[in-house]
Amino acid sequence: IGPALPNGLALSWESVPSRSYVEMTVAMMKELGFDITLEGNSVTMAPYTATTPRTIALERDWSALAFWCEVVALSTSASLFFPGLQPESLQGDRKVLDYFEPLGVGHTFTSDGLQLTKKRSLVYGKLVYNLEQCPDLAQALITTCFALRQPMEIFGLSTLPHKECDRLQALVELATELGITVQ
């Protein structure tokens, strides 16, 4: 609502989970012609000035891809294509490809999109992930590691209890049901 306010809006914060979403929002607002500035931990939006209407293309959702990466990781053979996903992305969840690669998920970009393929797992020991900037990947990544009995250490999950349900508690309950030790 910032640009709709008579004096615009200025916001500051000490820390922000998922900073990439703030950066993506600012970039999209700029592309639409809004006067918005992000500097450090503050954002300033000037009052809206009417401009020529613009149409922009929205990126595909990278967090939704995590569950398809899980399907590939848990399969013995798979090849899936996702039109429209490109390597350049403002979304923090773009890291999903890096996180699932050691679990046997290969990827190739084409001009039309993204190809996922089953590869040999590259894991030798415990995986360590920091999901502070992409917490929406936690469910798919953690349940994949559960299913593969892959030791892992994951941190940066402080926002999970504040989603539509307590995602962290749900994952702990699932681990308990599967006989997996969670610390």
Residue ranges and their predicted role:
Residues I1-Q183:
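Short, structured segments at the rim of ligand-binding sites
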